């Protein structure tokens, strides 16, 4: 989980919260906002549909102010989720999300002109759907994240 920054056409800054499942490579959250606080992150996470209706064991994050909030800590504690903090100044500790953010920057944020926050969110949603449904990943055997999840669920069902 990480944050990115960009600007609307008029120069007004906004943030994008990104959350990706490292196992399936599925983009779970792309949420835009002018100001996203720790309380907002906890509320957004409450609404995330994690695969298999199960919460992750851990979420890897950096030491940004949004991630060291009491609200996020409480949310994670109540769900027995470990918040795994990367070392300050070491983006390589969370290389997967940094790589994902690079793709998001190159393919969505840098190629679009955002007229409003709603326009930015709509374009982020379209990019996320494309990423999850139509983009195969070599690390997933050239399946899309959605195909990989579907195959994983079918394998689990067939084992019982």
Region roles according to the model:
Residues 61-63, 69-73, 83-105, 117-125, ...:
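RNase H-like two-metal-ion nuclease catalytic core shared by retroviral integrases
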Residues 8, 12, 30-54:
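Active-site beta-loop-alpha junctions of metal-dependent nucleic acid enzymes
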Residues 1-28, 34:
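An active-site-proximal beta-strand-loop segment
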Residues 26-30, 84-86, 110:
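Short small-residue beta-strand/loop micro-motif enriched in glycine and branched aliphatics
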Residues 31, 58-62:
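Short catalytic-loop micro-motif centered on adjacent basic/acidic residues
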Residues 79-81, 106-160:
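C-terminal domain-tail junction helix/linker
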